[in-house]
Amino acid sequence: KSYAEWMVRQQWQKWNVDAYFPMNYNDFYLRGPKWVGRVTREEVETAGGKPVYSGLFICHDWENKRGDIDPENSGLVPSEIAAAVQAAREAGAAGICLFCPSHMTEAHWAEFDKAIGLK
């Protein structure tokens, strides 16, 4: 089974969509940011030529992440952004989407800009 089918019971090969925006929440599966590449590669293969925009889950209170057990405070901290973006690109993602952009702090945006080549 694909990650999508195994993890969230989604059978993409049966969908008629223009693009995919999977929520690649590495922390939910106790994986580091490079896991995004592994799952994105499979998503690209499953998508049958349609674009995949790898969804990155952003930690909104990243300075207190280590002491918080709430899964809603999971996600990428600024220092992990570059590894996740690079892994998704190398795996064939057409782009990146952010869940949730409102969680992005100045530090997240600075690292994101570097990761996509704006700085």
Report residues per predicted region.
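Amphipathic coiled-coil/heptad-repeat helices and related helical stalk/stem segments
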Residues: 4-6, 36, 81
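Distinct, well-ordered alpha-helical segments
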Residues: 1-13
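Amphipathic alpha-helical interface segments
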Residues: 39
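Substrate-binding cleft of secreted/luminal carbohydrate-active enzymes
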Residues: 15-33, 42, 50-119
